[in-house]
Amino acid sequence: MVRPQSAAEFDKKKVVAENRRARFDYAIEQVFEAGIALQGTEVKSLRFGEGTIAESYAEVNGGEVWLINANIPEFSHGNRFNHEPKRPRKLLLNWREINKLHAGVARQGMTLVPLSVYFNSRGRAKVELALAKGKKAHDKRESIKERDWKRDKQRLLKDRG
C-alpha cells in the first residue's frame, strides 16, 4: 500500500549539484527554474548524485537557452549508449522567461549562472538559473565582513540569553 505524502514531504526537492561559489562571486538579481533536456544515461548518472556545475554557465543562442560546461559523468553501466560528459544541454523555459534572460544578458555585466541542479517532487530534473552581476573584489570582502559580523552577533546573543 502506498503511504500518502504530507505537504512537507511533497514539496521537498532532491539537490544533486550545487554551485555554492556563485552566491559569493555574483550578485543575484533574479532566479528562474528551468527544465533540462537530458539523455537517459544522464538522468541515471544524476540520480546517483554525480554531476558538477561549478564552472558552468548558460547562454541565450537563437531563442534557446543552453547550459554550457556542466559535467555529468558517464553512467557506469551505460556501455556504448553513453553520453558525452560536457556536452551543451538545452534548458526548457517559457518564451517570456527567455526574453527576460536575453534582455538581462544584453545589459552590461549580466550573466546566467546555474545555482543548483535538482529533482522536483515529480521526479523531473530542474536547473535553478540566476540572472546575476559579477562582484568586484571589494564587494566580496564586504560580504565576508558582513557574514563574520552576523556570526559574532549570533554568538553574543547566544551567550547573553
Swiss-Prot record:
GO CC term (a single one): cytosol
Main location: cytoplasm
Region (Disordered): 140-161
PROSITE patterns, per database record: SSRP
Keyword Transport: no
One of the protein's GO biological processes: trans-translation
GO molecular function: RNA binding
Location in the cell: Cytoplasm
Coiled coil (residue ranges): none
Record keywords: Cytoplasm, RNA-binding
InterPro entries, sorted: SmpB, SsrA-bd_prot, SsrA-bd_prot_CS
Entry-linked Pfam families: SmpB
NCBIfam families registered for this protein in UniProt: PRK05422.1, smpB
PANTHER family attached to this UniProt entry: SSRA-BINDING PROTEIN, TMRNA-BINDING COMPONENT OF TRANS-TRANSLATION TAGGING COMPLEX
Function according to Swiss-Prot or TrEMBL: Required for rescue of stalled ribosomes mediated by trans-translation. Binds to transfer-messenger RNA (tmRNA), required for stable association of tmRNA with ribosomes. tmRNA and SmpB together mimic tRNA shape, replacing the anticodon stem-loop with SmpB. tmRNA is encoded by the ssrA gene; the 2 termini fold to resemble tRNA(Ala) and it encodes a 'tag peptide', a short internal open reading frame. During trans-translation Ala-aminoacylated tmRNA acts like a tRNA, entering the A-site of stalled ribosomes, displacing the stalled mRNA.
Family classification: Belongs to the SmpB family.
Protein name: SsrA-binding protein
Gene behind the chain: smpB
